[in-house]
Swiss-Prot record:
Organism of this sequence: Yarrowia lipolytica (strain CLIB 122 / E 150) (Yeast)
Keywords recorded for this protein, A-Z: Actin-binding, Cell membrane, Cytoplasm, Cytoskeleton, Endocytosis, Endosome, Membrane, Repeat, SH3 domain
Residue ranges of every copy of the SH3 domain listed in the record: 4-66, 68-128, 356-417
Name the UniProt record assigns to this protein: Actin cytoskeleton-regulatory complex protein SLA1
The encoding gene: SLA1
Family, as annotated: Belongs to the SLA1 family.
SMART domains linked: SH3 (SM00326)
Gene3D superfamilies named among the record's database cross-references: SH3 Domains, SLA1 homology domain 1, Transcription Factor, Ets-1
Domain of life: Eukaryota
Entries under InterPro entries matching the protein: PH_SLA1 (IPR056996), SAM/pointed_sf (IPR013761), SH3-like_dom_sf (IPR036028), SH3_domain (IPR001452), SHD1 (IPR007131), Sla1_SH3_1 (IPR035800), Sla1_SH3_3 (IPR035821)
Length: 1136
């Protein structure tokens, strides 16, 4: 057999493998060349190392060179290699040693071209002819026995080489090692003394071995292979104590073992010798267990474990010996012991075989003798049958001990013929003769098997892999796009696609992970249906045309793939030709339900010819949903021109002619939302007012026309009701009467509308003036309400305020308006007398309440707030300081410069500007009646409360078209804050300062109340209304100059005087007119100027003259505001 290695090389440099096929090595490493290449500069080599480290790979030729030889050796004996890595040689062959790192095996070269491993103890440094040492080695003392066989010749070879001797002069190798072995091991190995001369060469060392393995190998080489093999194994795997015989007997051999019991291991000692087997646990205090060799039923080994089965008593052991060699040694010892025991039985067998007429039998069951003529036998024991004819039930037998007796014949089985006995004897002989070599052969076979396995794996790994057909290679991608591979399709089995990659590796990928394009490719190539593995999102997102195309493709694929299998099957029925799936998709059915419906139609063998006859009842029987039934029926009606009025299409299963829950008698879907919309129109609160107050806007008949609209086809339903509903709603038309209606209703609630003010005004002033004023007042809110439709919420919000404070204010204000001449003075007197406190509560209450009664309840809150604001009239000096300084004089000038129309449009400005006009006597005040101003203020305040721009109010107020919205937008914001904070202080001053109407002190209370009402959004309206009512008489009595003069004088004075003077003096002067104001509120009818005015003066003389004199007022107002700020409180912010 050729050598495995082709050369030995040494590495010149370090090299790191770059691929799996390459080999990593370091400098000066030994490499065994396995293959030479003539095409490139890469060689296949094996890296030298311990056994089991078979590192094989490619190495670059430029990185290695032939390894130098270490020394020269010679073969001492003939040797035939056992594996392909070893080398066969003859005695005396010259060997070149390249690697001697292993003490038992050398890597050598023979003849310059054969490389391999050889046993180290089969070689020597000198040729066999040059070694005379064996003759001299015999008389050497025992102490020199451990010297190796080649050691005595080494110094002779170096110092004085001897001429070669004839071969017959050199004794045979076994004779050289026999004397020392006999003297040394005679006592330790008596059992193995037999047949020591069978083998002369030294034993084979273990192939895998390191530097430590050779330390325990005997150096003398004496003894036969059996003794040497056992001793070497023991010395290599056991401690030195284990090699020594036990103290009880020199023939016992012991090994430390571990008994395996489940997951536990217990230390113990196993001893074999003298025909006995003993087992002694380490922690046991009693006697060790022992069995004779005949009780050993079975023994075997597996790697490091030895299994023993005994009888008498029956016990089984699983022993762990630490290494496989130790386990083999124990098995070897047991085999020798069992062979020695069986040798005596074999002699008896031979004697029985040679004896005539005697048969051999085997005991099947254990039998204990109970009589004198009986004999005890054990199960499995061989006995001689002496007589089996005397009795059929009892046979005379003789056991192995020579004791004869009778045993039941059923307990004995006759042994086979003599041929069988001879075969048994031969087997026993062979077993005893070959058992000594079992361990050695087993280890050698294991090594050979391992090498063969490694070679096979290496060859399989190195074998070139098959490549796929380049024409079938394509790029495959998974569904996520992260995995891509170039491979050819092998097939699709069990939901997996088998691919052959370009590198030769074959893989299988689940169909559910592959992209849709790849699945379609597999379907086209293999004909396998993979629709279930495709994602559902594709079906949802794709168009119906794509889904039909995919379905048709799958149908064609199924038909093509099943053509061969369906050759013997009946021909497909015509129903399979019609695409029910596409039909339902065209009808608008959900894609998930299409397949289920298609399966039902196909299962019932329905084709396209039955479509004209399909009715809703047929569709229901096939499991279609109601909505899908309507879609399919509609599609069929359109396709075949059916009217859709027949019972087949419109009548449900139950035969209800009135239609179903969702469809009418015509089969069309019902518009259930139309009824709801109709009810919404009926329940609209504004619509009821529209119907009552705006008859021309009512459109009930169109609402009644909706039922016939429902009877129209489904397509016409959405348009018809949509056109009529906006006509019914007409938010603008109903809202206008709604707003005016709410105001009119509040006005017409009229405990107040009989308006004593109107009667008083008629008596006080010319009725002609009052009538146009009232007409304007009623008309203006109407127009204003039309523009302010969204302000209904404001009215609703004001209503609760009116209920609480209005009623009180109304009660208080009604007498103020009716007896405006008589009761007015009283009210004003209480207000003035109360000073600042009494004025806001009493004075303004009466004034705004009178106006508020006419005004809707929404402005009642203004009266309450107006009460506080008129209280500010008492503190007219305070407001003058803050408001008059900032806005009073300036605003007055602006108001004078700007037309009163603009100020009136401003809302609260409205009340203030007219007062300025009245005070100054300007034609503007006379031109625009106060009622109009107040009436406009009310809608404006409503709008203001609704936070709508005052511009809309101005637009709504036709009377004040001349008044621009600018003053209202500019001034009201500032006065609101100032006047609102100064509610407790007199509102006249606060309102006047922001609105510039403060100079009109005679109208201070109402004007300021108007300004405050603008700030308070609610109160100003009431006050303005009340004031407006009062002002109405003033306007009617515009010719009354005396009343206007007091207003004009202080107002002019305030205007003429510098701004600082307005702060001080105007307040003083204003108090003088303020007394007039008190009389004016009583005489707000101005027609009563004579009588109530006098009353007002008297009131002023009573309270103001004594406490609020003209001159004392200046220090009081200015001083209190400036000096008492330190004593300000939340209720008295200015420290009055």
């Amino acid at each position: 057999m050729p050598s495995l290695f082709h050369g030995v090389y040494q590495a010149l440099y370090d090299y790191e493998a770059r691929t799996e096929d390459e080999l990593t090595f370091s400098e000066n490493s030994l490499l065994y060349l396995l293959e030479k290449s003539s095409t490139d500069e890469w060689l296949k080599a094996k890296k030298a190392g311990p056994a089991g480290t078979n590192e094989i790979g490619l190495v670059p030729l430029t990185y290695i060179e032939p390894a130098p030889a270490k020394r020269q050796a010679y073969a001492l004996y003939d040797y035939d290699k056992q594996t392909e890595e070893e080398l066969t040689f003859k005695e005396g062959d010259a060997l070149t040693v390249y690697d001697d790192s292993d003490s038992e095996w050398l890597l050598v070269c023979r003849g310059g071209d054969e490389y391999g491993f050889v046993p180290a103890n089969y070689t020597g440094d000198a040729p066999p002819s040059a070694a005379p040492a064996p003759v001299a080695a015999i008389p050497t003392p025992v102490a020199a026995i451990p010297t190796p066989a080649g050691q005595p010749t080494t110094p002779i070879t170096k110092d004085s080489p001897l001429p070669p001797l004839p071969k017959d002069a050199f004794p045979p190798p076994p004779q050289a090692y026999r004397p020392p072995a006999s003297t040394t091991h005679a006592s330790t190995e008596p059992v193995y003394a037999n047949g020591r001369d069978e083998e002369s060469p030294p034993p084979m060392p273990a192939r895998p071995g390191g530097s430590g393995n050779g330390s325990g190998r005997p150096s003398s080489g004496a003894g036969d292979s059996r003794s040497r093999g056992s001793s070497v194994s023991r010395s290599r795997n056991a401690s030195s104590a284990n090699d020594k015989p036990s103290s009880s007997s020199a023939n016992f051999f012991t090994w430390p073992v571990q008994e395996v019991d489940g997951r536990k291991k217990r230390k113990a000692t196993l001893a074999i010798g003298n025909g006995m087997i003993m087992f002694s646990p380490e922690r046991s205090s009693g006697q060790p267990q022992q069995w004779p060799v005949k009780d050993l039923v079975n023994y075997n080994s597996e790697k490091k474990h030895v299994f023993l089965d005994f009888k008498h008593p029956t016990v089984s052991f699983d022993l762990h010996l630490g290494s496989k060699d130790t386990a083999d040694e124990v098995i070897y010892a047991l085999g020798e012991l069992a062979g020695a025991y069986n040798s005596s039985g074999l002699t008896e067998v031979m004697m029985a075989a040679n004896s005539a007429g005697q048969k051999l039998g085997k005991v099947l069951y254990k039998f204990d003798a109970q009589g004198r003529d009986e004999v005890s036998v054990e199960e499995g024991e061989n006995v001689f049958i002496i007589d089996d004819t005397k009795s059929r039930d009892w046979w005379m037998v003789k056991n192995s001990s020579g004791v004869a007796g009778v045993v039941p014949s059923s307990y004995i089985e006759i042994a086979p013929s003599e041929k069988t006995l001879k075969k048994v004897v031969d087997q026993q002989r062979k077993a005893s003769g070959s058992s000594r070599d079992k361990s050695r052969d087993r280890s050698r076979d294991d090594r050979s098997r391992d090498r063969a396995d490694k070679r096979s794996s290496r060859s399989s790994r190195d074998a070139p892999k098959s490549k796929p057909d380049p024409r079938k290679v394509r790029t495959w991608t998974d569904r996520s796009g992260a995995f891509k591979v170039d491979a050819a399709l092998l097939g699709c089995v069990d939901g997996k696609i088998h691919l052959h990659k370009v590198n030769g590796v074959k893989i299988a990928v689940a169909c559910s992970k592959m992209a849709i394009e790849d699945l379609e490719y597999v379907e086209d190539v293999t004909g396998v249906d993979l629709e279930e593995d495709k994602p559902l999102s594709r079906d949802r997102g794709g168009s119906s045309r794509d889904r039909r195309r995919s379905t048709s493709r799958s149908d064609r694929r199924k038909s093509s793939s099943g053509a061969a299998s369906s050759a013997n099957a009946p021909k497909p029925t015509p129903e399979s030709d019609y695409d029910w799936f596409g039909f339902f998709l065209d009808c608008g059915v959900d894609v998930h339900a299409c397949q289920r419906y298609a399966t039902s139609f196909t299962r019932d063998q329905m084709d396209e010819s039955i479509l004209p006859e399909v009715t809703p009842s047929t569709l229901r029987s096939l499991g279609l949903k109601e909505g899908d039934i309507l879609r399919v029926t509609k599609k069929l009606d359109e396709k075949y021109g059916r009217s859709g009025t027949g019972t087949s299409a419109s009548t449900p299963v139950g035969g209800n002619p009135s239609g179903g829950l969702f469809s009418d008698t015509t089969g069309a879907l019902k518009n259930n939302t139309s009824k709801t919309l109709t009810k919404a129109d009926d329940t609209d609160p504004w619509s009821s007012l529209d119907k009552q107050q705006a008859p021309p806007q009512q459109q009930a008949p169109p609402v009644q026309q909706q039922p016939p609209v429902q009877q129209q086809p489904i397509q016409a339903q959405p348009t018809a009701p949509i056109q009529q509903q906006p006509i019914q709603a007409q938010p603008t038309a109903p809202i206008q009467p709604v707003r005016t209606g709410s105001i009119n209703d509040l006005m017409n609630i009229k405990p107040l509308q009989p308006t004593p003010t109107s009667s008083n005004l008629q008596t006080q002033a010319t009725g002609g003036i009052m009538q146009p004023i009232q007409q304007q007042y009623t008309q203006q809110p109407m127009s204003q309400s039309t523009s302010a439709l969204p302000q209904q919420s404001m009215n609703t919000g004001i209503l609760p305020q009116t209920t609480g404070p209005l009623q009180q204010s109304l009660t208080g204000s009604a007498p103020v308006q009716n007896p405006f001449l008589t009761g007015g003075p009283n009210t004003l007197l209480s207000q003035q007398t109360g000073g600042l406190v009494g004025v806001p509560t009493g004075g303004l209450v009466g004034v705004p309440t009178g106006g508020l009664q006419g005004v809707p309840t929404g402005y009642t809150a203004q009266n309450v707030l107006g009460m506080n604001q008129p209280a500010n009239t008492g503190g007219y000096s305070m407001n003058a300081i803050t408001n008059a300084l900032a806005g009073a004089s300036l605003n007055k000038q602006q108001q004078q410069q700007q037309p009163m129309v603009q100020q009136l449009t401003g809302g609260s400005m409205f009340g203030q500007q007219p007062m300025q006009q009245q005070l100054t006597g300007s034609s503007i005040f006379q031109q625009q009646p106060m009622q109009q101003q107040f009436t406009q203020q009310q809608p404006m305040q409503q709008q203001f409360t609704q936070q709508q721009p005052m511009s809309q109010q101005l637009t709504g107020g036709s009377i004040f078209n001349s008044q621009p919205q600018q003053p209202f937008q500019q001034q009201p914001m500032q006065p609101q804050q100032t006047s609102f904070q100064q509610q407790q202080p007199f509102s006249t001053g606060a309102s006047a300062s922001p609105f510039g109407s403060q100079p009109t002190t005679p109208f201070g209370q109402p004007q300021q109340s108007a300004g405050l009402s603008y700030f308070n959004n609610i109160q100003p309206l009431q006050q303005q209304q009340a004031f407006g009512q009062q002002m109405q008489p003033q306007q009617t009595f515009q010719p009354q100059q005396p009343f206007q003069q007091p207003f004009q004088q202080p107002f002019q004075q305030q205007q003429q005087q510098p701004f600082q003077q307005q702060q001080q003096q105007p307040f003083q002067q204003q108090q003088q007119p303020f007394g007039g104001l008190q009389s004016q509120p009583t005489g707000f009818g101005f027609g009563n100027s004579s009588s109530p005015f006098g009353g007002m003066q008297s009131q002023q003389t009573g309270a103001p003259s004594t406490s609020f004199g003209q001159q004392p007022l200046q220090p009081t107002a200015t001083g209190r505001q400036r000096a008492n700020l330190a004593s300000a409180t939340p209720n008295n912010p200015f420290g009055f």
